[in-house]
Amino acid sequence: MKENTLRKTREALLMSKAELARAAKVSPITISRIENGLPCRMETKRKIILALGLKISDKDKIFHD
């Protein structure tokens, strides 16, 4: 199983799943699914990256497609 960078990044920022979901305008279930290794749409990835305060160019640091 791949290392879960989204979870580590979220926890390093002291954000709960609910806080990240609210900031990214996605459901907390979506955050859980992604953290458990399920795929998501590119638009969802974009929302999450921006909600974490990162740049779109940092996508590969969070999502290992």
Language-model features, listed with the residues they occupy:
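Short basic helix-loop element that most often maps to the first helix and adjoining turn
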Residues: N4-A23
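DNA major-groove recognition helix of helix-turn-helix/homeodomain DNA-binding modules
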Residues: M42-D60
